[in-house]
Regions:
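Alpha-helical bundle segments enriched in helix-capping/polar residues
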Residues: 2-300
Length: 300
């Protein structure tokens, strides 16, 4: 019993230290992001003023300055947003460790209880407290995506043979030894904010025939039209012929109008899943960083 208490205290200290470390990292990155947000604002207005000044001396030099500014500002924005994403990731890691600290005091309320998966017709769904408050599902639930939550419920309600059970136990043992990898994986998934409805819409979209790839002319126009439109528009602005500059946009608008219904249909099926897909990619990338030893994990 004394040894058990020592083990619990050691685990508590581990989670407490990790929570403090990740929280400190999050606060440091947040301060850095805020500082450079001001720099970004000043750089934007300063660059606009500089471009106006250059344009007064030379329209061509002004166009070059605009292109350089857009490229530089895009790179800066990308770097700045990367700081924000890492800050949010560190904050998630801090919260994960705080949650695990709470579980050592028998508080599992921060985890979904899976009540939606209760099935009165299932022989063990209710009488074994598989789902609902203080259920086995809530006790074991460390899923971070809708697909993961659904898969866990399926595992608890589907009979499997002893060989499969042994493979799962071996994979659990392997993963239990790598706290760092597990928590980063969980943190990436927690930001996905996916739903089964989004997943079903994506599956429906994937099964649809593409309307761009088979059309060679459309593929060529997708590449050439933005380049030509931008070049012609910039030339008319340089010549101060604004009316013709506006007219140069009409071919691109006509092409867009022709395909707008199809584009809107694709947008409807994918727009809400963009964030989820981005985080699915992070999860897959994180899986690829680890070489698994057990057969069950290698088959993923």
């Amino acid at each position: 019993m004394i040894q058990t208490e020592k083990d619990i205290h050691s685990i508590q200290e581990l989670y407490r230290q990790r929570a403090q470390e990740f929280q400190a990292n999050s606060e440091r990155l947040h301060s850095k992001y805020q500082r450079f947000a001001l720099v970004r604002l000043l750089a934007f207005f300063g660059s606009v003023a500089l471009i106006i000044l250059i344009w007064q001396y030379s329209g061509l030099a002004g166009i070059v300055a605009i292109v350089v500014f857009l490229l530089a500002f895009y790179r800066f924005m990308t770097w700045h947003q990367a700081i924000k994403r890492e800050q949010e990731h560190q904050a998630e890691l801090a919260l994960i460790n705080q949650n695990e600290l709470a579980t050592l005091d028998h508080d599992f309320t921060m985890f979904a209880d899976g009540a939606a998966y209760q099935d009165p017709l299932h022989p063990n769904s209710i009488d074994l407290d598989l789902f609902g408050p203080y259920s086995f599902y809530q006790y074991t639930n460390r899923t971070s995506t809708a697909l993961g939550a659904n898969y866990l419920a399926s595992m608890l309600t589907t009979n499997v043979d002893s060989t499969t059970i042994q493979k799962r136990q071996a994979s659990i043992k392997e993963l239990s030894a790598d706290l760092e990898w597990r928590q980063h994986f969980l943190a990436y998934g927690r930001k996905a904010e996916d739903t089964l409805e989004q997943v079903n819409l994506l599956k429906k979209w994937i099964k649809q025939a593409p309307f761009i790839i088979p059309n060679r002319l459309l593929r060529a126009l997708l590449i050439l039209m933005p380049i030509l439109t931008t070049a012609v528009f910039a030339w008319f602005l340089y010549q101060q012929q604004f009316f013709f500059g506006v007219l140069s946009l009409l071919p691109a608008l006509a092409l867009l109008r022709k395909h707008v219904l199809k584009v809107n249909s694709v947008h409807e099926q994918t727009t809400h899943a963009e964030k989820a897909l981005r985080h699915y990619a992070l999860l897959i990338k994180h899986i690829e960083t680890k070489g698994f030893e057990t057969e069950h994990l290698q088959d993923l």
